[in-house]
Amino acid sequence: MEYGLDLEYSFNEFLKGFGLSSEIAHIIWLPLPMLLVLVAAVVGVLVTVWLERKISAAAQQRIGPEYAGALGVLQPIADGLKLLVKEDIIPAKADGILFTAGPILVLVPVILSWLIVPFGQNLLISNVGIGIFLWIALSSIQPIGLLMSGYASNNKYSLLGGLRAAAQSISYEIPLALSVLAIVLMTNSLSTIDIVNQQSGAGILSWNIWRQPVGFIVFWICALAECERLPFDLPEAEEELVAGYQTEYAGMKFALFYLGSYINLILSALLVSILYLGGWGFPIPVELIAKFLNLPINAPLIQVFTASIGIVMTVLKAYLLVFIAILLRWTTPRVRIDQLLDLGWKFLLPISLANLLITAGLKLAFPQFFGG
């Protein structure tokens, strides 16, 4: 039986109470999920930027943002407003069309990837059944935008940054996909909902991180490289390339890169939470909660409670990983480009391939533990 709150059904029933037909209620509902995704992504970025600035300040024995709101919580909003009102400059010798299209091509696939992120049994924008395949396909578009931005800027530093970004993304996309395929192999499904449901039954012991520790490590390393986080921020290494492919950008175009980078980091953390850490699952079974409250399992209060707990659990697990990513920024040195490519092609790719083959063997030998 499926537990949790079905937002679409509840919203349609609410509108029907005002005399609207099912078709009109469905049409009104259609744009709302994407609006919710945009709001959630932007709020997530604001929280992450504030956390990074405060944690970075603590690592350097500084105070960090302090004056814009309590504890500086409004500083990310102030930064966004500053970029919003800055002049949008296009270099005289740049390719204007590609220069403008580059940031859009970087941001849009990342936002669309949020469509497959579930926060509960029914709290999913689009359960297409091939969510993992859709995410891998969308993530392969981003390097085109990065390379396009570097080329269109007509700047040697931008071009080098774009080439580095494309090489880095391609190098780490393959082991990333292979580590996810091991999860798909155990689940027999490309649906993120099925992957989370497969991790239920024994609480924390059901999580895929215990059956896929190598895949978890490979996925997280590759995700950090895809997000261009230290120690993998070579495309925009300030000491070498000024700001890489972002060098000639200003105003909102620069903000789109900034936004895309942080949305991608949060998305990667959410996917790790879903694929390896049980997603919205929490230790106490829903049946026990309903029995304790003396309510039926499908009571509205139980549905709201399980939906709320599911969202909180998913986000908490994701932000634990974001916290680790921020700490890595101040505890690891930047690698060289040859070291980065060697790590991707000579180590992570063979390890992810071996992990996939071992998973297939374990599935045949122990189907009760590794999927049937």
From Swiss-Prot:
It catalyses: a plastoquinone + NADH + (n+1) H(+)(in) = a plastoquinol + NAD(+) + n H(+)(out); a plastoquinone + NADPH + (n+1) H(+)(in) = a plastoquinol + NADP(+) + n H(+)(out). Keywords: Membrane, NAD, NADP, Plastoquinone, Quinone, Thylakoid, Translocase, Transmembrane, Transmembrane helix. One of its GO terms (cellular component) is plasma membrane-derived thylakoid membrane. It is an enzyme of class 7 (translocase). Its main location: membrane. It is a multi-pass membrane protein. GO terms for biological process: aerobic respiration; photosynthesis, light reaction. It is found in: Cellular thylakoid membrane. The chain crosses the membrane at residues 27-47, 97-117, 128-148, 176-196, 204-224, 266-286, 308-328, 347-367. One of its GO terms (molecular function) is NADH dehydrogenase activity. Its EC number is 7.1.1.-. Belongs to the complex I subunit 1 family. This is NAD(P)H-quinone oxidoreductase subunit 1. It comes from Prochlorococcus marinus (strain MIT 9301). The lineage of its organism: Bacteria, Bacillati, Cyanobacteriota, Cyanophyceae, Synechococcales.
